[in-house]
Amino acid sequence: MSQFTNVAITKEANIYFDGNVTSRSVHFADGTKKTLGIMLPGDYEFNTGAKELMEILSGDLEIQLVGEEWRKISAGESFEVPANSSFKLKIYKITDYCCSFLG
């Protein structure tokens, strides 16, 4: 799905890592939430509360989930992160993403 309809968007950005990772929250009528964001090249570590689905819309990166090896992710691919966990990212070029909160 490349477009969302009937949503509310929080105007204030979510800003992480001195502005190198930013996103906007999109709220759906059914109570679910997604964030749409951009990550600049760099190394980052995130913690999760809810289970997440990360869809990579454009970019080039590697991800490491807890207890797993690094793996390459490209535009058009996605990965899931368990609830109450963490993951590491190596961003090699500007990356556009959509994060869905599943829990």
From Swiss-Prot:
UniProt keyword Metal-binding, yes or no: no
EC number: 2.4.2.1, 2.4.2.2
Record's GO cellular component terms: cytosol
Keyword hit for Glycosyltransferase: yes
Superkingdom of the source species: Bacteria
Entries under InterPro entries matching the protein: Ppnp, RmlC-like_jellyroll, RmlC_Cupin_sf
Family: Belongs to the nucleoside phosphorylase PpnP family.
HAMAP family membership: Nucleos_phosphorylase_PpnP
Protein name (database record): Pyrimidine/purine nucleoside phosphorylase
